[in-house]
């Protein structure tokens, strides 16, 4: 690494970005069971099991509410088609609450299969790293003391922007994992809503939201692939320009590319909902 402070600051900012990007690549290919050694998943599964008893009790409540809403009188419930429909709904709701964790794991596995297919088709095993061009390093190292003063300001601003964008992006990806854990913990309560026709929209909304959370990983991977293709052709640097101009031009174009990826990652949830109607 160069001994120049300006170069070191930019390289440290790019190192932070590359580390967070590599961490994202690992996170989107990781299952909730393996995340952080599985300790969080174990706690959520324990909560899921405890909440399941509440879900089973709510099935009865939602079922009675549904019967009272759809059947005007007790005589209506005696009709075979109505009774069979109510029984099937009750049985399916109980199955959803009892086997909800397995159903959610199956949905997540399908989404992870999609992520793996996208990565294999694109031929990417890891994201492309952002590297400071040699021309900029040479130009900055050749600057005198007074010439380097404006470079300090430009470097501080650029380094701060790159670092902030890195943490915004990684926080969004971690937020996806936390949402999946929250869905896992309270799933029995939401699944119990399928027992009643008036409340089934709660269960449908829950399943759609969980599916959208799973599919966010595919959108994030696509964003990383797009950024990697951008990073494969680094910003063009004019070797005849002043050092401060070269650095400012490089940082400006790099931050624009970073904003594309950060924006894609942050909008992954909305993009999935708009594309899939979830």
Model-identified regions with their sequence ranges:
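Alpha-helical transmembrane segments
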Residues: 191-208, 240, 271-275
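Alpha-helical transmembrane segments and their helix-start/interface "positive-inside/aromatic belt" motifs
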Residues: 1-10, 80-102, 203-214
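Binding/recognition "hotspot" determinant
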Residues: 1-58
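Hydrophobic alpha-helical transmembrane segments
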Residues: 53-65, 157, 161-163, 180
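Non-cytosolic segments of integral membrane proteins
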Residues: 93-186, 224-277
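Juxtamembrane "helix exit" motif at the C-terminal ends of alpha-helical transmembrane segments
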Residues: 63-72, 220-236
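Hydrophobic transmembrane alpha-helix segments characteristic of membrane transport
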Residues: 58-94, 186-200
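Alpha-helical membrane-interface segments at transmembrane helix boundaries
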Residues: 44-52, 84-88, 92, 141, ...
């Amino acid at each position: 690494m160069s001994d120049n402070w300006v170069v070191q600051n930019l390289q440290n900012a790019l190192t932070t970005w590359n580390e967070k990007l590599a961490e994202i690549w690992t996170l989107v290919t990781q299952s909730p069971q393996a995340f952080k050694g599985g300790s969080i998943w174990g706690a959520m599964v324990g909560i899921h099991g405890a909440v399941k008893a509440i879900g089973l009790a709510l099935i009865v409540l939602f079922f009675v509410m549904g019967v009272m809403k759809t059947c005007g009188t007790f005589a209506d419930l005696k009709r075979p088609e109505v009774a069979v429909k109510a029984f099937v709904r009750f049985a399916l709701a109980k199955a959803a609450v009892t086997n909800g964790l397995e159903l959610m794991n199956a949905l997540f596995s399908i989404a992870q299969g999609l992520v793996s297919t996208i990565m294999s088709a694109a031929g990417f095993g890891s994201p492309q790293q952002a590297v400071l061009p040699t021309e900029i390093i040479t130009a900055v190292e050749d600057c005198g003391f007074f010439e380097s003063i404006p470079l300090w300001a430009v470097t501080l601003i650029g380094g701060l922007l790159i670092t902030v964008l890195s943490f915004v992006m990684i926080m969004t990806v971690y937020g996806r994992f936390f949402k999946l854990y929250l869905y896992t913990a309270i799933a029995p309560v939401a699944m119990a809503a399928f027992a009643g026709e008036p409340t089934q929209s709660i269960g449908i909304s829950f399943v759609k939201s969980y599916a959208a959370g799973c599919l966010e990983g595919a959108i994030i991977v696509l964003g990383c692939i797009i950024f990697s293709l951008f990073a494969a052709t680094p910003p063009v640097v004019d070797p005849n320009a002043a050092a401060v101009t070269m650095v400012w031009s490089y940082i400006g174009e790099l931050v624009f590319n970073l904003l594309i990826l950060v924006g894609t990652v942050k909008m992954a949830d909305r993009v999935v909902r708009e594309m899939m109607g979830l």
